[in-house]
C-alpha cells in the first residue's frame, strides 16, 4: 500500500532545501497548496454529485435525465453554475443584511472543515487529531448556526419555520451519529481517523469484524446521516409543498448556490465518514488466507478504494431519497427519540460487551 506521506515529506524537503524557504515559509506554502487542493476537490465532487443525483433520480423514475447539454448531459451542471453566477443577489428590505449574507458562508465553512477531516489515503489526511471524531462532530454542528441565522435574518415566516425544523432535526440526529461512532471507537480503541483506517487495514473492516452490533450501527448511521443532510425522506426544512424552499427561500444567485453546494458536499462527507468508520476507508479488501488476492488488492491505490466506497454509500443514500415518501416533522423526531436513540444506546452497550469478551473477528 502506497504511503502518501513520502510525497508530503519530499515536498517539505524540496521547499526548505532546494527552494531555500525558512520553516515558516515552507509551512505557509504547504498550507496554501492544501487549501487549493481542498477547494478544487470541493468543486469537482460537487459537480460530480449533482450530475450523479440527476442520473440516479432519472433511473429510478424510468427517465433519461440530462441529455441535451454536452454528451449525455455532462455539461448541464456547468450551464447551471454559469446561470447561477449571472443571477442578481437580492436582499429583502426588512432583513438583517449582515447575518443574511454571513449565513451561507458559515454553512460552506463548516462543510469545508469537515471535508478536510476525511482520510483519502495512507498518509494523505489534511486534519488528523487524536480526538478526530470529536473534532468532526463539533465542526459539523457549525452548519446549524448558519441555517438558523438564515431563517431568522430573512424576515420570512416560511424561512424561519424551515430553519427551526432543520435545527431540531440536525441536533436530534447528531445523537445517533455520535453513538454509532462511539460504538466503532470501542471496537478500534482510537478516535484518530488515520489510526481507525490503519486498524482496519491490519485487522479487517469494522463492519465485518464487529459482528451484528457493527451492522446495526452502520444501518443507524445511514438513516441518521441522511436526516443530518436534510435529504429525502427527511427534507422537511425545505419541502416545496409547505415552505416554498425552506430556510433559503429569500436567497438568490450564488448565495443560494452555496447552500446547494454545501448540501451535496455534506452528502459526500456523510458517505465518506461511513466508509472511514465502517468500510475501512482507504484500506483495501482483504480475505484471510488468500495472500495472492490480498496482494493484488494492495496494488490498487488507497484513494481509489476510499472514493469508490464513498460513492457506493452515496448511491445508497440517493436510493433512499428517491424511494421513500417524505415524513412529517413529528414522525421524523419520533423516529429519532423513540427508536434510533434507544437502539443506538443498546447497540453501544452490546459493542462494548463484545469487545470486553473478545467476541470480535
Name the predicted role of every residue range.
Residues 1-361:
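Selective transmembrane helix interface/packing segments
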Amino acid at each position: 500500500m502506497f504511503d502518501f506521506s513520502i510525497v508530503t515529506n519530499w515536498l517539505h524537503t524540496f521547499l526548505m532545501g532546494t527552494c531555500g524557504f525558512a520553516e515558516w515559509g515552507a509551512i505557509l506554502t504547504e498550507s496554501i497548496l492544501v487549501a487549493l487542493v481542498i477547494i478544487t476537490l470541493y468543486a469537482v465532487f460537487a459537480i460530480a454529485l449533482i450530475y450523479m443525483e440527476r442520473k440516479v433520480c432519472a433511473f429510478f423514475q424510468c427517465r433519461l435525465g440530462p441529455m441535451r447539454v454536452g454528451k449525455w448531459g455532462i455539461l448541464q451542471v456547468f450551464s447551471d453554475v454559469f446561470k447561477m453566477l449571472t443571477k442578481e443577489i437580492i436582499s429583502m428590505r426588512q432583513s438583517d443584511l449582515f447575518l443574511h449574507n454571513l449565513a451561507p458562508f458559515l454553512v460552506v465553512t463548516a462543510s469545508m472543515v469537515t471535508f478536510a477531516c476525511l482520510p483519502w489515503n495512507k498518509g494523505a489526511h489534511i486534519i488528523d487529531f487524536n480526538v478526530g471524531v470529536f473534532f468532526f462532530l463539533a465542526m459539523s454542528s457549525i452548519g446549524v448556526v448558519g441555517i438558523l441565522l438564515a431563517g431568522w435574518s430573512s424576515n420570512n415566516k416560511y424561512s424561519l419555520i424551515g430553519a427551526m425544523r432543520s435545527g431540531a432535526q440536525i441536533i436530534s440526529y447528531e445523537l445517533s451519529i455520535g453513538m454509532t461512532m462511539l460504538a466503532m471507537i470501542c471496537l478500534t480503541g482510537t478516535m484518530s481517523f488515520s489510526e481507525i483506517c490503519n486498524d482496519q487495514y491490519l485487522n479487517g473492516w469494522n463492519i465485518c469484524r464487529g459482528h451484528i452490533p457493527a451492522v446495526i450501527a452502520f444501518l443507524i448511521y445511514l438513516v441518521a446521516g441522511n436526516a443530518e443532510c436534510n435529504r429525502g425522506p427527511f427534507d422537511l426544512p425545505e419541502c416545496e409543498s409547505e415552505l416554498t424552499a425552506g430556510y433559503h427561500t429569500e436567497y438568490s444567485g450564488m448565495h443560494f448556490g452555496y447552500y446547494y453546494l454545501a448540501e451535496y458536499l455534506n452528502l459526500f462527507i456523510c458517505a465518506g465518514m461511513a466508509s472511514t468508520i465502517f468500510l475501512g476507508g482507504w484500506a483495501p479488501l482483504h480475505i484471510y488466507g488468500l495472500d495472492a488476492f490480498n496482494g493484488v488488492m494492495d496494488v490498487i491505490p488507497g484513494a481509489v478504494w476510499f472514493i469508490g466506497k464513498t460513492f457506493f454509500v452515496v448511491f445508497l443514500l440517493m436510493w433512499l431519497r428517491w424511494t421513500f415518501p417524505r415524513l412529517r416533522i413529528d414522525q421524523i423526531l419520533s423516529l429519532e427519540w423513540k427508536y434510533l436513540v434507544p437502539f443506538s444506546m443498546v447497540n453501544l452497550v452490546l459493542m462494548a460487551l463484545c469487545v470486553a469478551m473478545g467476541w470480535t473477528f
